[in-house]
């Protein structure tokens, strides 16, 4: 690892023992992955994955205190992943007891630490920090120190920023010292595609399902996707960004994708085209049959496989404003067709606080509320990590939530059928 004079001085402790430990940790981290240098973090804001005050994370709180007490707070303001708790989300007395007394008993204390370290503002808790309403949107080429997998893959792919799939705490350390190790997706070579994925479906593929298929196939490699542009309208508009948000989250969770290129759509694919494809790239063809095969491969891990769903979560990652509006229209229309006025399964739509605030300013907010759908900014995954929640039959159209929890995956159309008409069994 070649360090600059300033970096070496930090490493040697000339700016204090605490900052030296941070630099030493990042250098060791980089050396494990063959990094040749430390490069400056250039984005305006950081984003942290650790937003939950789990009782078991005592070493994290101790480390945070060391940083705060030594004056080594973040050089950037930052957003953080969603909060784990919400009184508006349906839960039993026992679930609440476990949440507050055993799992997230340190939530208030931890949020105080995040405030001292430099969180953007009190409601900057979302996994979709890059939304315009939130304001943490990196520019093309900027170097980041993020770790939330769905945000990293979005920033790399849709925005053209540069960030590795870091871990929690490592993300904060990059902001504290102002540098990250250069390897992997921070390099030109590391951003070359080693897979060509050909989309040969007869209709627009479900974002979460296509992302799952590609993620499980290429794992941590970089795919160059051909044929998806015709289903996305040929440009990177808000609808395409929303699609790629959900698609990317599935590639990152069902596999370990940190970057993908979509021909004629994503910025680097538009700029460099097929020059992004490495020699001897493998080929993966996705057609209707392949998507159906992947869909049917998902295990159902409910204790009672034919149980009636008790809860539906939508918004992992958090929903966009347009998604909230579109789903309001779909739910209202489907309920009308079914002769109902309210959803027949408790349903939660999650989104960033800033997005929800904007949504509340539209006439759609009252329409959705009248259907019985709850909107909030909780992290569905953190809710499902409660052992008592895990036993509940929960449905979702998020392949990330399906992968990490006991929630059962359905397509968007099937979710709509379930929550408005009680159908779509399979």
Feature annotation, model-predicted:
Residues 1-313, 317-426:
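Non-transmembrane, aqueous-exposed alpha-helical and coiled segments at domain scale
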């Amino acid at each position: 690892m070649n360090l600059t004079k300033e970096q070496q001085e930090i490493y040697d402790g000339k700016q204090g023992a605490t900052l030296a430990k941070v630099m030493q940790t990042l250098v060791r981290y980089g050396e494990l992955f063959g990094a040749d240098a430390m490069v400056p973090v250039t984005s305006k804001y950081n984003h942290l994955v650790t937003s939950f005050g789990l009782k078991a994370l005592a070493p994290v709180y101790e480390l945070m205190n060391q940083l705060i007490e030594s004056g080594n707070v973040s050089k950037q303001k930052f957003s953080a992943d969603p909060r784990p708790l919400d009184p508006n989300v349906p839960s039993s007395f026992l679930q609440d007891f476990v949440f507050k007394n055993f799992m997230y008993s340190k939530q208030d204390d931890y949020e105080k630490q995040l405030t001292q370290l430099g969180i953007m503002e009190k409601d900057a808790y979302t996994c979709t920090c890059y939304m315009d309403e939130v304001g943490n949107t990196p520019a093309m080429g900027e170097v980041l120190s993020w770790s939330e997998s769905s945000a990293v893959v979005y920033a790399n792919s849709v925005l053209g920023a540069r960030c590795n799939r870091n871990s929690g705490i490592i993300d904060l350390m990059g902001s504290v010292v102002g540098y990250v190790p250069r390897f992997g997706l921070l390099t030109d070579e590391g951003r070359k595609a080693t897979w060509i994925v050909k989309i040969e479906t007869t209709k627009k593929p479900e974002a979460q399902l296509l992302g799952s298929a590609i993620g499980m196939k290429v794992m941590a490699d970089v795919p160059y996707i051909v044929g998806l542009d015709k289903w996305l309208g040929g440009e990177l508009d808000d609808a395409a960004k929303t699609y790629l948000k959900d698609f990317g989250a599935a590639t990152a969770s069902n596999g370990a994708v940190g970057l993908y290129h979509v021909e004629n759509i994503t910025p680097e694919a538009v700029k460099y085209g097929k020059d992004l494809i490495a020699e001897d790239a493998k080929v993966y063809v996705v057609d209707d049959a392949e998507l159906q095969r992947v869909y049917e491969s998902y295990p159902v891990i409910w204790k009672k496989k034919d149980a009636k769903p008790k809860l539906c979560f939508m918004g992992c990652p958090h929903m966009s404003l347009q998604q909230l509006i579109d789903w309001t229209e779909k739910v209202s229309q489907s309920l009308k067709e079914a002769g109902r006025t309210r959803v027949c399964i408790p349903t939660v739509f999650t989104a960033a606080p800033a997005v929800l605030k904007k949504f509340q300013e539209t006439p759609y907010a009252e329409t959705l509320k009248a259907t019985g759908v709850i909107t909030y900014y909780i992290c569905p995954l953190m809710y499902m990590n409660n052992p008592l929640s895990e036993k509940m039959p929960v449905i979702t159209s998020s392949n990330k939530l399906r992968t990490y929890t006991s929630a059962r995956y359905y397509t968007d159309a099937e979710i709509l059928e379930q929550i408005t008409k009680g159908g779509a069994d399979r």
